[in-house]
C-alpha cells in the first residue's frame, strides 16, 4: 500500500508538472502569435498608411528582413530595397493611400490578413511588361479588398503572398473596360 501511495504521489506530481509546462508552452506560443499580428498591424499603420514616405521607409527597415520577398500578381520582388522602392512609388502615385486591416489570423510563423485598400491615383502607374501598359492618372478614388499571407522570421516580415483585387481597382479608376476586360485609354486628371 505504501508503494502504491508513493507511485500515485509521483504520478500526480508529474501530471501537475507536465500540465504546468504545457500551459507555459501554450502561453508562450500565444504571445508569439500576438507579437506576429502586432508586426503586421504596425506595417499597415506605419508603412502603408503613413503619409510621410521617409518615416514609412524607416519603419520598413525595422519591420522587414533584408531578403524580404513579395509574391503578387506581377511576379516576385526580391529584397527590402526593391520593396521600399515599391512603397515609395505607391505613395507618389496615391499620396492618400491607406490600408485598413479588417481581420487577422496567426498560426505558426504566418499571419493572414484581410484588408481594405483605398487611395486616389494622382500620377501615372508605370507599365509592367507582360502585364499592363502605362496607366494614366485618373484622380479617381478607389477602394478594393486584399488578402495577404505574411511569413515572419525572428520578429521581422520575411515573405508576403498578396492577393489584391487589382482588376476591380482598375475598373473603378476607369482604366479597364469591364465588358471587354481590356485596358482602355483613360481621361487623365492633369
Regions found by a protein language model. Name each.
Residues 6-8, 118:
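Short helix-onset patch at the extreme N-terminus, typifying the N->h transition
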Residues 17-190:
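C-terminal and inter-domain tail/linker signature
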Amino acid at each position: 500500500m505504501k508503494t502504491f501511495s508513493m507511485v500515485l504521489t509521483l504520478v500526480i506530481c508529474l501530471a501537475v508538472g507536465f500540465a504546468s509546462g504545457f500551459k507555459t508552452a501554450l502561453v508562450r506560443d500565444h504571445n508569439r502569435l500576438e507579437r506576429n499580428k502586432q508586426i503586421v498591424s504596425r506595417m499597415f499603420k506605419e508603412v502603408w498608411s503613413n503619409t510621410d514616405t521617409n518615416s514609412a521607409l524607416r519603419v520598413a527597415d525595422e519591420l522587414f528582413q533584408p531578403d524580404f520577398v513579395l509574391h503578387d500578381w506581377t511576379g516576385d520582388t526580391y529584397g527590402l530595397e526593391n520593396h521600399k522602392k515599391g512603397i515609395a512609388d505607391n505613395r507618389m502615385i496615391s499620396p492618400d493611400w491607406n490600408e485598413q486591416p479588417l481581420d487577422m489570423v496567426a498560426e505558426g510563423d504566418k499571419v493572414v490578413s484581410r484588408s481594405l485598400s483605398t487611395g486616389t491615383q494622382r500620377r501615372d502607374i508605370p507599365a509592367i511588361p507582360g502585364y499592363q501598359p502605362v496607366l494614366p492618372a485618373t484622380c479617381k478614388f478607389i477602394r478594393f479588398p486584399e488578402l495577404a499571407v505574411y511569413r515572419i522570421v525572428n520578429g521581422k516580415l520575411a515573405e508576403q503572398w498578396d492577393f489584391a483585387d487589382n482588376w476591380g481597382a482598375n475598373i473603378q479608376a476607369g482604366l479597364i473596360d469591364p465588358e471587354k476586360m481590356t485596358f482602355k485609354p483613360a481621361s487623365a486628371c492633369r
